[in-house]
Amino acid sequence: MPIQEIRHPLIRHKLGLLRRAEISTKNFRELAQEVTMLLTYEATKDLQLVDHEIDGWVGKVKTQRIAGKKITIVPILRAGIGMLEGVLNLIPSAKVSVLGLERDEETLEARTYYKKLVPDVANRIAMIIDPMLATGSSLIAAIDVLKASGCKDIRVMVLVAAPEGVKKVQAKHPEVEIYTASIDDGLNEHGYIVPGLGDAGDKIFGSVQKD
């Protein structure tokens, strides 16, 4: 199914800690990375395996290793950077592509202001990471960029998602699988996810304004 809400007990517990109003930058970063690792486990369950033989301590040992398409991780600036280490902890050999998106104040649509994709991105599984799927505009723009670059297998990992954004993305890109720790209640009048996490970018980079 295109949208998968992963309700593993560890994810539910760590997500509850992430939602606290009073949380340090250090704790938010660590928890975001931990939840990302758990989402990565789910998002990669269908990777191809091939039989492989190695030299073990008692001689030849039959094992398996990942084969097929290689992976590129695609963090959306800036908040997506906060999830990057969580993926790399499990897939340290993955290449990283970067997309910068911002809202055009005239059209209110997302536009690309930075793009640095690996040269062979079309031949890789592209895993987009961004803490929040709110209105869906940024994610749709990111998927559009990757498809225009030849990507055929695109997956998305977000910490929390709003139903409005999920519906919008699925209408435009129904084949793209989305993995999230929570489908929240919805968006408020300002376009923020409720209950959400607050401004994930500010919390990850320590730029939260104090009263």
From Swiss-Prot:
Amino-acid positions noted as binding uracil in the UniProt annotation, renumbered to this chain: I193, G198, D199, A200
GO terms of molecular function: GTP binding; magnesium ion binding; uracil phosphoribosyltransferase activity
UniProt keyword terms in alphabetical order: Allosteric enzyme, Glycosyltransferase, GTP-binding, Magnesium, Nucleotide-binding, Transferase
EC number(s) recorded for this UniProt protein: 2.4.2.9
Record flagged with keyword 4Fe-4S: no
Residue numbers binding 5-phospho-alpha-D-ribose 1-diphosphate: R78, R103, D130, P131, M132, L133, A134, T135, G136, S137, S138, D199
GO biological process, one term: uracil salvage
Catalytic activity: UMP + diphosphate = 5-phospho-alpha-D-ribose 1-diphosphate + uracil
Known cofactor(s): Mg(2+)
Cofactor comment: Binds 1 Mg(2+) ion per subunit. The magnesium is bound as Mg-PRPP.
A Pfam family assignment: UPRTase
Enzyme class, first EC level, given as a word: transferase
Pathway in which the depicted protein is active: Pyrimidine metabolism; UMP biosynthesis via salvage pathway; UMP from uracil: step 1/1
Record text on activity regulation: Allosterically activated by GTP.
Purpose of the protein: Catalyzes the conversion of uracil and 5-phospho-alpha-D-ribose 1-diphosphate (PRPP) to UMP and diphosphate.
NCBIfam families: PRK00129.1, upp
Family classification: Belongs to the UPRTase family.
Name of the molecule in the record: Uracil phosphoribosyltransferase
Origin species: Acinetobacter baylyi (strain ATCC 33305 / BD413 / ADP1)
Gene designation: upp
